[in-house]
């Protein structure tokens, strides 16, 4: 590992994920296990990279843009693996792994620049910043999952509602066909339940993360009142998820409307992250 | 020794005529009574026409599967058909309702029926069980024999091959199955779901049964006449199934809607039982939990507008029917491959059956050779045990090749004259064998030859298994 840069390391799990999809596309049942094994191998390698790098560089090593993107991919993968284990919904793994792979590729191309936080934050604030990043990323990963699940929900709900392209019985018996052609396992109740779980776990994390962000902003700019675009988008996102959670708990909102809420919320997250990290770093409030 | 099938099905007769036949052979007692009459049919020489018999009766067909006596010829087959037709129908021309298949065509027909190629819904699995029942009943009434045993086992084997080697049964096509599969697209687990069945139709019953099979524990049945609903439950469901069912007043079903997840509607009502305005408040009370409505009644009993309500999914019989249509197409495509398998199996069966024609000749030939050897060897060997051993050994060695050729000749129709030539050459007369005092367990020899011919030594044990 020491002969490779961090960016090159990200390509190892990336290529494993891409390679694994070749086995899935072969549409042979015996190759499905190879696909699953490769996905888990990719995840284990991702985890090894994370822990070894953490051991070598410490937490300050995490304060680079590429590392944050890599970390985000790792968190998404943990969430996906856990959901796959709990809900036995193979389509989650099939749909989300490409997003993880894209994240790893972005990590490779992202600037390998460390953000010097020592000069601007105290030790305590550095810990707060790290926690802020971790919480926001875990929350965002859960919302990313909710976003994909919501898309599947809307797609599947439409098929059931209009009664078209709904294959009930075509037993091709391969997960690729089951997922993409038959929508096997896509029952609306489970999709809605998973969406709700993502919201229930993700919302408190995002809330704490945003609160920490506001605290850090105050610490950095010595005022709560300086309104930056990232804060507006973050608060708007938070508000959408807060309304969604409230409606779900108090009024029993579920189904298509809940899915639409999740999609809108995540699109706002994507826009805030893209703006803050890739397009305009100053958008976040710092250079 | 000919196989004869006479019967009527949905293809040859309408439901009214099928009902007439079905009613007269509805119970095992009625069938046994009719079977006795058939087995007592005699030819002009007062010899029984039918050796073995099985009666197959399902909702779509009634068939009489027979193995005729060796002396029965084509004329007798028509006589049997006329007798069957006259037994069930008084009207003239009723024999046109019945079809008749002989030998290869009969075997092919039975194998097609067993493989569900001749069913109203191609590929449906029930028919094989019904054929097994018919065979078991034939065994029970002791009307079966070597030929029908082989014929039925070959039919079971053929049906199994068709199901495993083609996709004929891979796409289920029943409304009840489709309803359950659709439910699985909406709900994660059916075990905790509540189902409301409105009406007591046949389709509703089948669907309710299918839901119970898939783990549903709570089914409420409401009918305008509560007594009829109670009677329906009593008549239609088994003990375990009844534990999952509650009969409620029809006036109370609306109160149950907010707690129900699936509604199955199969009433005979001419108007809508569930309207758009009825469901709107229910959905609010349900806190937007999905509601699946299945309307299998004609005319429809659920307002189609209801499908526009969010989290409500309404499927009527046409919607489900369209999904099944695709599967029927798949099955029809597979039927071609399946027919080839049926034909191959029917040919194999006929080869085996034809080989039986050689058995009496083989037995006579063996006896003849043994007799000659016994007379000649008795002059030189006194000890019986040693003599018998030598006689058997020599008979086997002398006749091994001729017997192989005789068996081949029996199967091959182009060499049909060989058996006759053989009889003439060795002066073999079927009628005089026993009169000449041969008591050598001819039946045992015949059985051994048959087993060799069929290549199926486990035939008897298989019969026991099925019994």
Residue positions per predicted region:
Chain A
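Short hydrophobic "helix-edge" motifs at membrane interfaces and signal-peptide entry regions
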Residues: 54-55, 121-123, 218-219
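Hydrophobic cores of alpha-helical transmembrane segments in multi-pass integral membrane proteins
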Residues: 3-116, 136-155, 168-181, 191-216, ...
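Membrane-interfacial segments
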Residues: 155-165, 219-224, 284
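Interhelical loops and loop-helix junctions of multi-pass membrane transporters/channels
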Residues: 116-129
């Amino acid at each position: 590992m020491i002969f490779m840069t961090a960016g090159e390391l990200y390509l190892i799990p990336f290529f494993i994920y891409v390679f694994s999809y070749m086995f899935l596309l072969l549409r042979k049942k015996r190759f499905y296990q190879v696909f699953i094994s490769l996905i888990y191998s990719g995840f284990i390698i991702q985890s090894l990279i994370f822990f070894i790098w953490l051991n070598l560089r410490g937490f300050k090593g995490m304060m680079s843009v590429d590392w944050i993107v890599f970390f985000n991919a790792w968190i998404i993968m943990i969430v996906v693996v856990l959901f796959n284990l709990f809900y036995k919904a193979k389509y989650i793994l099939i749909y989300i792994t490409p997003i993880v792979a894209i994240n790893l590729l972005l990590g490779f191309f992202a600037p390998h620049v460390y953000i010097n936080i020592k000069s601007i934050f105290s030790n305590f604030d550095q810990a707060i910043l790290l926690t802020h990043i971790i919480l926001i990323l875990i929350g965002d990963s859960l919302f990313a999952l909710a976003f994909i699940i919501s898309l599947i929900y809307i797609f599947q709900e439409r098929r059931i509602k209009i009664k078209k392209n709904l294959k009930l019985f075509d037993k091709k018996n391969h997960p690729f066909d089951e997922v993409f052609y038959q929508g096997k396992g896509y029952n609306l109740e489970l999709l809605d339940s998973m969406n709700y779980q993502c919201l229930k776990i993700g919302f408190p994390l995002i809330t704490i993360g945003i609160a920490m962000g506001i605290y850090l902003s105050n610490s950095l700019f010595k005022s709560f009142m300086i309104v930056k675009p990232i804060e507006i988008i973050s608060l708007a996102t938070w508000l959408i998820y807060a309304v969604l959670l409230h409606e779900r708990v108090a009024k029993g909102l579920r189904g298509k409307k809940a899915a639409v809420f999740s999609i809108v919320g995540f699109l706002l997250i994507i826009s805030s992250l893209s703006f803050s990290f890739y397009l305009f770093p100053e958008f976040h409030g710092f250079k | 020794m000919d196989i004869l099938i006479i019967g009527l099905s949905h293809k040859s007769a309408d439901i009214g005529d099928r009902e007439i036949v079905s009613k007269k052979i509805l119970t095992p007692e009625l069938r046994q009574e009719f079977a006795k009459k058939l087995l007592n049919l005699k030819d002009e020489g007062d010899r029984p026409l039918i050796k073995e018999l099985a009666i197959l009766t399902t909702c779509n067909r009634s068939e009489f599967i027979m193995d005729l006596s060796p002396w029965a010829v084509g004329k007798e087959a028509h006589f049997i058909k006329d007798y069957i037709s006259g037994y069930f129908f008084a009207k003239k021309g009723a024999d046109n309702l019945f079809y008749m298949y002989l030998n290869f065509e009969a075997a092919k027909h039975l194998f097609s029926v067993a493989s569900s190629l001749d069913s109203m819904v191609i590929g449906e699995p029930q028919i094989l069980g019904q054929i097994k029942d018919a065979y078991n009943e034939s065994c029970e009434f002791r009307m079966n024999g070597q030929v029908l045993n082989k014929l039925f086992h070959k039919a079971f084997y053929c049906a199994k091959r068709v199901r495993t080697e083609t996709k004929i049964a891979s796409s289920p096509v029943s409304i009840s199955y489709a309803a359950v599969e659709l439910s699985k697209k909406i709900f994660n687990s059916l075990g905790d779901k509540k189902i409301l069945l409105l009406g007591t139709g046949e389709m509703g019953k089948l669907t309710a049964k299918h839901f119970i099979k898939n783990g549903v524990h709570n089914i409420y049945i409401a009918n305008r006449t509560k007594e009829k609903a109670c009677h329906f439950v009593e008549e239609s469901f088994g003990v375990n199934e009844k534990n999952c069912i509650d009969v409620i007043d029809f006036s109370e079903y609306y109160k149950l809607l907010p707690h129900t997840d699936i509604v199955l509607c199969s009433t005979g009502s001419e108007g809508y039982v569930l309207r758009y305005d009825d469901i709107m408040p229910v959905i609010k009370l349900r806190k937007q939990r999905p509601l699946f409505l299945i309307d299998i009644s004609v005319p429809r009993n659920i307002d189609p507008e209801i499908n526009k309500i969010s989290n409500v999914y309404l499927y009527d019989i046409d919607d489900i029917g369209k999904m099944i249509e695709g599967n029927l197409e798949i099955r029809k495509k597979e039927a071609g491959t399946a027919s080839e398998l049926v034909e191959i199996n029917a040919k194999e069966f006929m080869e085996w059956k034809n080989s039986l024609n050689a058995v009496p000749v083989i037995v006579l030939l063996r006896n003849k050779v043994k007799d000659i050897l016994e007379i000649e060897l008795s002059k030189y060997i006194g000890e019986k045990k040693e003599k018998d051993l030598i006689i058997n050994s020599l008979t086997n060695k002398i006749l091994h090749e001729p017997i192989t050729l005789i068996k081949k000749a029996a199967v091959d129709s182009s060499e049909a004259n060989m058996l006759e030539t053989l009889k003439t050459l060795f002066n073999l007369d079927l009628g005089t064998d026993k009169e000449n005092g041969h008591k050598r367990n001819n039946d045992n020899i015949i059985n051994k030859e048959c087993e060799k011919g069929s290549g199926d030594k486990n035939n008897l044990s298989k019969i026991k298994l099925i019994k």
